Amino acid sequence: MSARPSLPPLPAKPAGSPRLRERPAPVGPGGEDAYSLLLRPQLGTRKVARAEEAGGEEGKREAEAWTRRAAASARRGGELRTEEPPPPAARLCCLGGGCGGGGGGGQKVSATASIPFSCKRALLTSTIPLSPPAKRRGIRTWGHPSYLTPSPTMRD
């Protein structure tokens, strides 16, 4: 007999790290594996799922209420998207078609290139009024000096 005891054979991988195919599948919040989570109907929001899992009849009622509200909100959003969008501001001034917008006629080019200067001036001068603090500071909207009146701070 030999003086050295025989050692057991070494394992191929350490015992703490199972092979990839031996690893358990990810488990969902209800103890389900990933495949069954994919197959079950989606609840839409985490809040609905938690309310339903919270249990009882009250959780189920709350989840149904959230689902109804989400469906109503989606319907309202869908109705809004089907409405005709308002015309762009650049096309409002040219009803005769001279600049390519509004009432037809004219060549369709980029919005700023197709607007005559008279319309551009009207668009530039009809801006949102300044806030009272901006008026006190004398801030003006920038534009062409020929049609902007000088502010009190710009006068000599």
Swiss-Prot record:
Q: Compositional bias of type Pro residues: which residue ranges?
A: 1-12
Q: Where is the composition biased (Basic and acidic residues)?
A: 49-67
Q: Which gene encodes it?
A: SERTAD4-AS1
This protein is called Putative uncharacterized protein SERTAD4-AS1
- Ranges for region Disordered: 1-89, 129-156
Q: What species was this sequence derived from?
A: Homo sapiens (Human)
The lineage, from the top, is: Eukaryota, Metazoa, Chordata, Craniata, Vertebrata
